[in-house]
Amino acid sequence: MRLPDFPWDLLAPYKKIASSHRDGLIDLSIGTPVDDSPLTMQSALASSGSAPGYPLTIGNATLRATLERWIRSKFFTVGPLDFLPTIGSKELVGLLPTLIQAKKVLIPEIAYPTYQVGALVAGAECVAVGDDCREWPKDADLVWINTPANPHGRVLSQSQLREIISWARDTKTIVVSDECYFELGWDREPLSLLQVADGDSAGLLIVHSLSKSFNAAGYRAAFIAGDPALIAQIREVRKHLGLIMPAPIQAAMRAALDDPAEIAIQKERYRVRREVLRAAFLGAGFTISHSEAGLYLWASRGEECWQTIEWAAQRGILITPGIFYGEKGANHVRVALTATDEDIRRAAERLA
């Protein structure tokens, strides 16, 4: 199997440059949370440490009850629905084409690299497509959409989502919406694919994660929800493969979803950091595109992205080249908001 190079390995020389800055490295390249996980999650994990038996692939009864309340209240109030907890969202993204035996997968032309990798692992053809679904190939098995999108933070509108659903129904294509940044709307509040499905989840799936909104990337806690027939197909394969969320993590996930106030607390932290970084990058001559939701600024100096990466590294700041996400990102860089308040302040000072 021939896979692309792991993108972040290519940043090593620039990390070395940035690390040599007299005041040290400020890493804004990877969207990994730095704030503490909620105490409710930590307590639930600690009190569930004794787990001698095998957990259920579908999730235990208390987690399932919580997940259904969460999904119904936020995304899909009526209509047939099923869901599964997953071991983070990345493994689900990487394995889903295999689990549903997809032969042709459509991904956004600027996209999270794991969409492509998942198609390659499945032996499927992978086609990058633009925004207009009327121009998409009609013979695909699976199409990934991402709203809010990583890396550029674009939010798909209600009309765009409805058009995609209509296209999918006409072409009998499965649509999976990666909504892992759903709770982090800034200039525009995101909509879930299921929110505009009029109670019909057939052929539709959504993926959500606790990693960013609850500072829980280390827990590997996420879920997939939607069409009961598709969830049943995915569940059966996952049962055979032993892809099961550990019982203590199920307990922590349930505790988090039962305490949604934590989302607002963390969102406010990111809002402040975003304002500081946005002003600093604009002041340094960058333009910022989209970035209306999510954990990143999609920025450009009007030059090839590796030049910008080196420019930032000379100032002790490590950011991500847009080319990692597709050829269309070649003149942009992605700036993560996931640094401490102090590091965000220091980065802004270096850009001044």
Predicted regions located by residue number:
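Conserved core of the PLP fold type I
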Residues: A51-W167, E183-G199, L205, I344
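PLP-dependent enzyme catalytic core of the Aspartate aminotransferase-like
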Residues: T77, D200, E303, Q314-T320, ...
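Conserved core segment of the aminotransferase class I/II
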Residues: D198, A202-R271
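N-terminal small-domain helix-loop-helix segment of the aminotransferase-like
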Residues: R2-G88, L95, A256-L257
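Helix C-cap/helix->beta junction micro-motif
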Residues: A122, D170-T171, D200, A284, ...
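Hydrophobic residues in well-ordered beta-strands that form the structural core
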Residues: I107, A128, S177, I319-P321
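Conserved glycine-rich beta-strand-loop-beta hairpin in the small C-terminal domain of fold type I
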Residues: Q250, R254, Y270-R278, I288-S300, ...
